[in-house]
Amino acid sequence: MDEADFSEDTTYKQEDLPYDGDLSPIKICNDYSFTSKNDAFEVSSQIIFIADDPQEKAMHNETCGNTAMTMPLGKTTENAANKKDEKEKQCTAALHIPANEGDASKSSISDILLHHLSKEPFLRGQGIDCETLPEISNADSFEEEAIIKSIISCCNKNSWPKEQTLELTDQLNPKKDGENSNKPGSPTMTEENTSDLEETVAAGDSSHQENVNILTKTKGPGDKQNSYQGQAPPKQHTEKASSGNRFKYGQGQVHYQLPDFSKIAPEVKNPKNNIINKPLAIAKQVSFSKLREKPAVVQDILETMPESNCVEKQHQEQKGEITEPSQQIQMEPTVHIHQELLTGIESEASISKLSPTSQKGTSSSSSYIFQKISQGKQMCQKLKEQTDQLKTKVREFSKRIKQESPYHLQDKKLVLEKLQGHLELLEQNFLATKDKHLTLQQQVHKHESTIVSDFDPERKVEGEIFKLEMLLEDVKDKVDESKYTSAPSLPVSSPVTLDDLASTSSSLSNEVPEEHPGHPPGPRGSGGSEATGTPQGGPQEAPKEELCELTPQIYLNGHYGDATVQNQPDQVAMRLSSNSGEDPRCTPGRQDCAETTAPSPSCAFCRRLLEWKPKVEKKGHRRIHCGRFSTVHEKAPHSDSTPNSDTGHSFCSDSGTEMQGNKCQDCGTKIPTSRRACRKEPPKEFHYRHNTPGENYSNHSKRGAFVRPHSLHESKNSSPSLASPFCCPGLMYSPDTSKSSPTPGWQEAELGLENMKSQ
């Protein structure tokens, strides 16, 4: 070979392997770049050899010409490690070519490379020694073996010779066919070109310089893209793998100026026999293509088949891939490398085997938990439906309570108890289901980060149960109300007619008690009302023996009435309002009340009573104070009222004083029958005794002891009877006593009593 300088530019670019997508059969370009259609894997290396003296150049050229190029395995490993750490970076270095070289292709670098890169930064670099791993002495150490395992693909793919890549470039790049067809180192790729390849390898320095020139020209991006368009079949790869086991000095170095490895004795020498190396290239290409295609296949299988079958098939495929290249390995250095590769693939297989298993366990447990959670949601939906049904029943029952008669009270209670029992059971089921759901939700949060929805997020079921409970409370209240109103209630007050008043005993106001000196009369207000059927007790028993029929007289009961009003005003008001036939005209705070209703005018007595009314109105007196008792002389504002047979004789009475009268029936007077025995004593024995100190008995006449102005002679034919009584506590009606003396009043009273006695 000539002593001409040998320069070679290589650029190396790599991306991670092996699972980047589908891999088409690998194409070998003239710049040692192994690429796929999607540019996922590119390995481009340009090797620069720097020689300081002609002897080293000659040694290096001779080694290249004889195809006996060697490279330390340890250094290759180190270079490959650096390439993996600094991926997608390009490094070029160029040896200074002497000026006396005549060939332009030998002394120039590609314009494209010079456009992007310059030689000076690489010539002034520190070198690779400051960045790389130790030298050849540690090539067989454990750390380097681990590195070999991780980047074995890079080591094997970069072992193609320059001559082989030159011919492949001529075939794959149509643009370079016309240029390279005339050169002796670019024959067509056929089976007969194996001998031509050997001749080209042994040609000499000129062929090497031409090859380097061609390699340099194809470094541009456009040439790179053109080189990807074609695809060499596996058979051509096999034929061109003549020197695939040749390791170049400094191959795979990145970014640094490479030292001269020509003086270093190679540790591994590869024979020239091309047939031995053919199975290696085939095995590697097939293995990597399968590894690249494996992720998509595994993913499809995982989605379509059970996990257990998927794991077994995946493991079998990996074993098949492992055994296939191992059976084709025939060289000692490559056997060691492939053993490392086998170890890495087996570890990957074990990892992939474990990960689907763990994924299976996790997915199975999570699916079980999610199944339980879905069951909890279904149970919540069932609870809501049950709540709605129970609410419908409660509403129907509430309507039935209003419609049914009160005699079905016991049935209502039974139905209410059943509804309450259903409500309690529904609440218990709701709480139990909610607790289960919460427990499952906590388990999911421990294993996974999946967010699980709440059992009752909007608390709809809980709200419905609460409304149902309130509705049942209302129904219960209605049932209780119906229980109290179920028994027929007695009327509080019944209308008091005149017949009832006639049949009852005479009131205490019609009775004139015989009082002895020093014995004050008992309070009239302590007794009950005869109209309401309440018995009178205590001091009220004494008047039973007294006269009950003093027809023309209405006695002045001032002190009794006063005491009654003062002591029991509430009872007076109650009893007055209890009689529907009574028209209470006086209140406890009012001491003057006069009321009368005339019976049918067919009665002569009633006619005379009506004639007497205007006289009373004209001669009314106001008040005459006598001690603490007051006698009221006033007009009768209600005496002019129209005769009303429905209401009968209305009167004002306290709790212990009641007046009753007769009703004229068929123009006749009816004699009231007293329940008490009447005393036939002369009226002279009747006295008004007042225990009030300072009271003058002579003033009794002025207070008007009797208020019957009409003559009793006219009513002799009709038995003495009580007409409409006029009595209020402490009140009375009296004629004008200013013009008449009290004597005629007493005379009338005595005359009336005598008539009664004679009858």
From Swiss-Prot:
The keyword Coiled coil applies. Keywords: Coiled coil. It comes from Macaca fascicularis (Crab-eating macaque). Belongs to the AKNA family. InterPro entries: AKNA_Centrosome-Trans_reg (IPR052655), AKNA_dom (IPR022150). Residues 497-509 have a biased composition (Low complexity). Signal peptide: none annotated. This is Protein AKNAD1. Residues 181-192, 484-496, 639-654, 735-744 have a biased composition (Polar residues). Residues 371-482 form a coiled coil. Residues 169-246, 484-543, 634-654, 678-723, 735-759 are annotated as: Disordered. Residues 679-688 have a biased composition (Basic and acidic residues).
